[in-house]
Amino acid sequence: MAIPITVLDCDLLLYGRGHRTLDRFKLDDVTDEYLMSMYGFPRQFIYYLVELLGANLSRPTQRSRAISPETQVLAALGFYTSGSFQTRMGDAIGISQASMSRCVANVTEALVERASQFIRFPADEASIQALKDEFYGLAGMPGVMGVVDCIHVAIKAPNAEDLSYVNRKGLHSLNCLMVCDIRGTLMTVETNWPGSLQDCAVLQQSSLSSQFEAGMHKDSWLLGDSSFFLRTWLMTPLHIPETPAEYRYNMAHSATHSVIEKTFRTLCSRFRCLDGSKGALQYSPEKSSHIILACCVLHNISLEHGMDVWSSPMTGPMEQPPEEEYEHMESLDLEADRIRQELMLTHFS
């Protein structure tokens, strides 16, 4: 059972009722354009979030000194979409930077609690077949139920001794594993992996790999780039294509895999706290992981609500560390190589 959280307005406690308080900011008093520019989401979507998260963000007995769920949601959206605790963001809704930080923490945890509600892999055959049909219609790649990749998000150094979060560029980061469908809906998100881990190691240790290795999704596969090992359930591109069929396979693979690359750019453009433009996330790895997951939940909710997430200008994620390519290891999985060869022979010859 979720435990409701009350955030007290520090400004009200310090200065009394004469100081401007959160509850004086009303959504109905501002324009839709203002809400989009400041918080990145339209009015009705914000109202939906307040209703969805309200039980977590307020106590059963309303206290006059508690920050309203509405204001907590606005504070969190302001941070997610700007990547900053700038004074102007707090001033816009009448709270201090300290209060805003607590609002972000509480909304983040409330969204993380609901991650499984909005980020889920399809289980029924009809939904899986629909995914395959949609991906096939995109570039002619059969059997695909999702595309997988990893993205690094910069975080502050946990401590001087811990090098596990230092990636190949010498920066501290989390390496986040994600799978999306053709619309950019995230079906799997794992945000807790340290930046020193290569993509292939993240996937190998993930719950996603365990599911596919256990045979939960037979006759289906994911598409991954050359930073992953070829598997019976994970098709990767050929390192050096030679035949026309191999070239056609690689072209279809690239066109299909580009969906998740676009999804990453969209995520980081909408949620600027992830793109590194305002610096690394100034939190512990655990809290940073939760913030990333909360943004992914919001991304999926906005897609469910029919929001156009692709039209905003795309800035892209932080510069990603280079990955090793593992095509020279593919021969270790002879069955996976056989499946890919059969795929090329049947569909790309």
Swiss-Prot record:
EC number, UniProt record: 3.1.-.-
Localization of this protein: Nucleus; Cytoplasm
Disulfide bonds: none
Cofactor list: a divalent metal cation
Keyword Cytoplasm belongs to the record: yes
GO CC annotations on file: centriolar satellite; cytosol; nucleus; plasma membrane
GO molecular function terms noted in the UniProt entry: metal ion binding; nuclease activity
Keywords tagged on the record: Cytoplasm, Hydrolase, Metal-binding, Nuclease, Nucleus
The keyword Metal-binding is annotated on this UniProt entry: yes
Principal subcellular localisation of the protein: nucleus
Binding site for a divalent metal cation: 149, 199, 225, 261
Physiological role: Transposase-derived protein that may have nuclease activity (Potential). Does not have transposase activity.
Quaternary structure and interacting proteins, as annotated: Interacts with NAIF1.
Protein's name according to its UniProt entry: Putative nuclease HARBI1
